[in-house]
Amino acid sequence: MISRVFKLRMWAPVGVLTSLTYCLHQRRVALAEPGGADQQNPVDRNLLELKMVQVVFRHGARSPLKPLPQEDQQVEWKSQLLEVPPQTQLEYTVTNLAGGPKPHSPFDSQYHETTLKGGMFAGQLTKVGMEQMFALGERLRKNYVEDIPFLSPTFNPLEVFIRSTNIYRNLESTRCLLAGLFQRQKEGPIVIHTDEASSEVLYPNYQYCWNLQKRTRGRRQAASLQPGISEDLKKVKEGMGIASSDEVDFLVLLDNMAAEQVHSLPSCPTLKRFAWMIEQRAVDTALYILQWEDREGLQMAVGPFLHILESNLLKVVDPATPPSKTRKLYLYAAHDVTLMPLLMTLGIFDHKWPPFAVDLTMELYQHRESKEWFVQLYYRGKEQVPKGCPDGLCPLDKFLNTISVYTLSPEKYHMLCSEAQMMGLGNGE
């Protein structure tokens, strides 16, 4: 979870999206007519060819972002937890989206202002987290190198595009994933692309999207006052001896509890006793902030990122796209606060907090005979059925229709984000 995140370029023109979606729909209609391929029948997966894979993942296990208020309830976060496993070591370079110097990371500067009991900084990727990411990389290797000879066994920059939020734990998580995926073998330099904090879209940018900030302002605090959440929070805080005035909600409790559990550190008995309730109430709190019915809010939270994923799909489908403009694999290092709204918009959110090193994988296939396109989603390695799709193997036009409700082009995103600010200026504020 990015601290403060609940507070306060690549793109396809609309005409291109509309025409491609229409063509995909017309092709499906024609194939469903007498003499064509009957889409009511199951698709023969042996006739499907994998064309592209996109993976959105959360970083590995880390130290908490905000310690609990009482020192006797805090565990020790010692520097030994930061040991780098040898198998994860891999050199990489970080640039901005245009290939220039790495931008400044205000989040990392903020984390270094908080020293936890034991000496570690807040939000640091640990050895456990590195091993988790290496294991995820090995799973991807099994899927796309060994089981299906889709990717080269060594890293090839012509096959892989990598983007991460500009936060050190995510950059290092990406390193470990790549080490597992390619067994530390590479044919060219590994470049991880990042963006400025002011224009980052790999997480809901509450700080710089004014309209999103306005819509959600106060919701986190209000969530703790909701019936059920309020009573449960009081019960947990009293059990831990936390004063009612202390700014500790279920998001802070879950952040500490999850970090302690994954590192097998001795959590306080109250956290252990209420573990299930803490996770559920943290999810309830996040859903109160995001709100299913707030379509524009979800659009601003994850719409630009959906647009990037959509654009990658459309570039592969478009026969006019030069091979040099596409990659076989797109990797996006993100956060729990990215995955939650992403899963919501896809209709596959399981009401569980996205754990460390979790992945959402999107595969694009083409039928060898009918030339139709299909999307297959996996979350935590399990097949998913997106909203509006007949089954796990979803016709591309249906999938595009599902995400079109929330997708935002850069122009629309900036326009929607600035609405609250412009209205304020118009009112003389």
Swiss-Prot record:
Its EC number is 3.1.3.2. The keyword Hydrolase applies. Detected in brain (at protein level). Its main location: mitochondrion. The active site is at H59 (nucleophile), D336 (proton donor). GO terms for cellular component: mitochondrion. Residues 1-32 form a transit peptide. GO terms for molecular function: acid phosphatase activity; lysophosphatidic acid phosphatase activity. PANTHER family: ACID PHOSPHATASE-RELATED, LYSOPHOSPHATIDIC ACID PHOSPHATASE TYPE 6. This is Lysophosphatidic acid phosphatase type 6. It comes from Bos taurus (Bovine). The gene is ACP6.
